[in-house]
Amino acid sequence: MASSTNRRPAIAGVAQIVQRAEDPREAASPLRLMERAIQLAAEDAGAPKLVESLDAIFVPRGLWQYGDPGRLLAERLGSPNARTTVGAISGHIVQILVNRACAEITAGRADVIAIVGGESENSKRRLQREGIPLHWDDQIPGEPDHRIGDVTFMRTPDEQDAGILNATSVFSMCDVSLRRSLGLTPSAHRDRISDLAHRMSQIAAQNPYAWIQREVSAEEIRNPTPHNRMVNYPYTKLMTSNISVDQSAALILCSAEAATRFGVPEAKRVYLRASTEMSKTILLSERDVLHRHPGQDLAAERVFELSDTNVGDLDHIDLYSCFPFAVQAGAAALGLGTDPVPSLTGGMTFFGGPFGNYVLHSKATLVERLRADPGSIGAIGSVGGSFAHFSYGLYSTDPGEYEAPRIEDVSDEFAAMPRRSYAAGYAGLATVEAYSVVVMREGPYQAVFAALTEDGERVWGRSHDPDLMAALLADEEACGRTAHLREGIIELR
């Protein structure tokens, strides 16, 4: 029987691809990008033959229509017997795939596993705009051997009626709640998050794999223009994740025995030291405060306990960055600020947000940093759903004292925590705690409000009053104001 040391999983190879096709008709499909990323990851490991010995291929779900992309990749790469897994659509799922891969390797059920994702969304959209039929013939239906993750966007009828319809609406509301807790004026907070985004663009400008490779000023990010419209106040387009990219990334994980057998140098190997995941969720209405999630705090606290480290031990950090709030909340959960900005890639606006695959890019970037800084520790923080699911991973070239990575799912512990009550169909007075304005291409559409009753129950309301929306977009304060609700419509007093 193999020793536990021989079963120690390590990331052996990584790769990233950015495709900038001058003619979208010549662009490679997502599948071809993923195939090439796995090949490059094997080459990075110094072991090209790894692609012919894959025991499993894990793929986070993308915008593409492949039923079982892992099977198509396995056949192309010469590993036809590889087991296939598709992960759910969620920003935190990549870390969960890494955790499952490590568990498979540690248990002896696999020696070599590839985790890969990719999108050609920019090329696809260019073809659609030009009226050119999509030329990819590889989007074949199928069913993977396994699926991981059951992530749903839960909302109450009151939340839905108020306009809580997607991640943008949730994160913008949470950012306003955070701003209020910090005692900042609306204008000062917009300056703050614009500067955060600006500093992320500086990182992306130096990243060869970034989609937008230029420094963007805070003023350009902050101020709405025809090319940078307001999406959900306080967010302009340059504060939101950019999914219109052509990018792919891959990791190859091996057991210690397999890495040695295939000739992967020790200096290439990077180890998962500890990880936490939190996949259960509660309604937005049930959160005590909108800008803090106890499940995220729990996951962050526990990953330090599992790894016998603290925030001061972290040398390299990348936090999920779909919106400015995600970065701020992730930093707060770890006990960090946002200066220096906790990003290795440049963030999901400027580096790019290839749907569920961004975290593979952040991990590939981290692996390269850790190899260049042996013995250092790096952290990746991920957010899924609408600030609902979380995962953390701590990595190093030093595997630490434990024979296997320490992984814990804190979902059940979180689910047992107390929740705020909410009042469905409420009519009466309440105090505004957060708000946003939904802005369509044609102009302001709807103001959305979260408020608390005198009894502390959360309620939701909306307004289509053009004067009110204009005032909010001009940075007028609404938090703390008394409001009257009736049949979901809110009037500020």
Per-segment meaning from a language model:
Residues G385-S386:
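C-terminal substrate-binding/catalytic lobe of Rossmann-fold NAD(P)-dependent dehydrogenases
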Residues G378-I380:
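Active-site capping/gating regions of soluble enzymes
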Residues F351, F355-V359, L370-R371, G375:
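A conserved active-site cap/scaffold subdomain adjacent to cofactor or substrate pockets
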Residues Q95-A103:
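Conserved phosphate-binding catalytic cores of ATP/NTP-utilizing and phosphoryl-transfer enzymes
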Residues M1-G87, C102-A110, A114-V245, A249-L251, ...:
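Conserved "HGTGT" condensation-loop signature of ketosynthase/thiolase-family condensing enzymes
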